[in-house]
Regions:
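Serine-dependent protease modules
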Residues: 1-183, 189-212, 219-224, 230-259, ...
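C-terminal soluble interaction/assembly domains
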Residues: 260-267, 271-283
Length: 283
């Protein structure tokens, strides 16, 4: 990973979503404090609004282009694997190398991630809304996905400019229920970290030891409560054969029964049909 001052770091992949081609990577910068982009919201965007796209178009670093939001809620299919819903359409110039770059509002806040451009057309580019990006990132960095553990909390919305995470439901028997959390609570802090996005909660809980008290500051009916969340030990990861075939080989497989093979006049009593192949995979 190369930063704007040309300092370089080796990145470690954490998690990846093949449907949107979004990935979480991690770098070790030591004691250095890295600048971060300010997050906006895509919940109040309007056609005609000015936007700014940043990227490495054709290898030209830090290319900045300006345009407007042309439309919202677009659907675009890039490949058999990548199928985007609810995209932002913009006429800001987006070229090869811009993919993965930020789409900003006039306040410099992140409102989307540039993901696609209409080949052969001018002024038609697409970005994944930041609220969707945060939802995907929260799942990619979740306790459930990375450590096979559950906190049992569901939140109402990602479109949240107020401090705190509004709890919509609590899973029965979960760590959250045992801690005393209830629907309607607003989680303001985990340990000493302020909470605004569910992704921040997942990041704060990752790596916490089993049985350790994790202090929460919770607002309930105008009163601030102090609760302790205790996570269980990691459960063994159970990965299905179908998931391994897709992630490692790039194959989607459908079992064939003996009767189906009989119709095909096959000498075998069972088998698999290839229903999809991931582009660029070993298959």
């Amino acid at each position: 990973v190369t930063l704007s001052d040309n300092s370089r770091f080796v990145a470690k992949p954490v998690s990846h979503d093949p449907r949107t081609d979004l990935a979480i990577i991690k770098i070790d910068a030591g004691d250095r404090v890295l600048p971060v982009i300010q997050l906006g919201t895509s919940g109040d965007l309007m056609p005609g609004e000015t936007v700014i796209a940043v990227g490495n178009a054709y290898g030209y670093e830090h290319t900045v282009t300006r345009g407007i939001i042309s439309a919202l809620h677009r659907t675009v299919q890039v490949s058999d694997v990548q199928y985007y819903h609810d995209l932002i359409q913009t006429d800001a110039s987006i070229n090869p190398g811009n993919s993965g770059g930020p789409l900003l509002n006039i306040d410099g806040e992140l409102i989307g991630i540039n993901v696609a451009v209409r080949v052969g057309a001018q002024g038609i580019g697409f970005a994944l809304p930041v609220d969707k990006v945060l939802s995907i990132a929260s799942d990619l960095c979740s306790l459930r996905r990375l450590e096979s553990r559950e906190h049992g909390i569901t939140f109402t919305s990602l479109n949240n400019r107020e401090q705190g995470l509004l709890v919509s439901s609590i899973e029965a028997g979960s760590a959250a229920q045992k801690a005393g959390l209830k629907p309607g609570d607003r989680i303001q802090r985990v340990e000493s970290s302020n909470m605004q996005w569910p992704l921040e909660l997942e990041m704060a809980l990752l790596g916490q030891k089993a049985g350790q008290n994790i202090p929460l500051s919770v607002l309930r009916d105008g009163e601030t409560l102090k609760l302790d969340l205790v996570l269980n030990a990691s459960a063994p990861k159970a990965t299905s054969v179908a998931d391994r075939a897709w992630t490692q080989l790039g194959l989607r497989l459908q079992p064939l029964s003996a009767s189906q093979l009989l119709d095909k006049k096959s000498k075998y009593r069972g088998g698999l049909t290839v229903t999809a192949v991931r582009p660029g995979s070993p298959a």
